[in-house]
Swiss-Prot record:
This is Small ribosomal subunit protein uS2c. InterPro entries: Ribosomal_uS2, Ribosomal_uS2_bac/mit/plastid, Ribosomal_uS2_CS, Ribosomal_uS2_flav_dom_sf. Transmembrane segments: none annotated. Belongs to the universal ribosomal protein uS2 family. Keywords: Chloroplast, Plastid, Ribonucleoprotein, Ribosomal protein. One of its GO terms (biological process) is translation. CDD domains: RPS2. It is found in: Plastid, Chloroplast. Disulfide bonds: none annotated. The gene is rps2.
Length: 243
């Protein structure tokens, strides 16, 4: 059974692609038509692939798998954080630091630094330091929060990654492919569907489009885990060295 109707997709503007001159020919099978120089996405396929993606993440969630949402563009940032938190997924919504996945142990030291500074802030320790030192540490804290807050509780690599705007998040996609982590990706008409395990052809610029699709995926993850946080957030097992 489809998780979304064509009417919902139309209302959210999911069918609007990029200018036809910016297209990736590999998206041809998912394009319905061209109107005034704009590619129109085939929403029948969008609905089918979104349903497939939701079934996939629901099953993974039932198995206790962990998820990472990635979307750093302005239109996606707030929605990515909101929907990830709602279903117990991790997220990166400001800046993808190279090596978050392929060099996780190094990134994890920065996560530990973030936790340390937050503990010092909560305890009042920072306020006891000289003003100049306090200002430096608070700037460091805010920078770490901005980039790492969504993966602060992540103790090992995610089992599945959900990407908004494949072209913008190309580094994240490359890292996933290198490590063999499955990718569910919202793809506009300028993207390459071959780089996603489950491509979802859709407008990746409109907030309503992003929210509709991520919302359906988050709903399915929540259904799979019955509203529980994914098991690895409580997993203290150390990750084996990433080759």
């Amino acid at each position: 059974m489809a998780v979304v109707t064509l009417a919902e997709l139309l209302e959210a503007g999911v069918h609007f692609g990029h200018q036809s001159r910016r297209w990736n020919p590999k998206m041809f099978p998912y394009i319905y038509a061209e109107r005034n120089g704009i590619h129109i996405i085939d929403l029948v396929q969008t609905a089918q692939l979104l349903t497939q993606a939701c079934d996939f993440v629901r099953t993974a969630s039932e198995q206790g798998k962990s998820f990472l949402f990635v979307g750093t563009k302005r239109q996606a940032a707030a929605v990515v954080a909101q929907e990830a938190e709602r279903c117990g997924a991790y997220y990166v919504n400001q800046r993808w630091l190279g090596g978050i996945l392929t060099n996780w142990f190094t990134i994890r030291t920065r996560v530990e630094r973030l936790k340390d500074l937050e503990n010092k802030e909560e305890s009042g320790y920072l306020d006891q330091l000289p003003k100049k030192e306090t200002a430096i540490l608070r700037r460091e804290l805010e920078k770490l929060r901005k980039n790492l807050d969504g993966i602060k509780t992540m103790k090992r690599l995610p089992d599945l990654v959900v990407v908004v705007d494949q072209k913008r998040e190309s580094t994240a996609v490359q890292e996933c492919r290198k490590l063999g982590i499955p990718i569910v990706s919202i793809l506009d008409t300028n993207c390459n569907p071959e780089l996603a395990d489950i491509p979802i052809p859709a407008n990746d610029d409109a907030i309503r489009s992003i929210k509709l699709i991520l919302g359906k995926i988050a709903d399915s993850i929540s259904e799979g885990n019955n509203g529980k946080v994914s098991s690895d957030q409580e997993d203290t097992q150390e990750l084996q060295t990433v080759q």
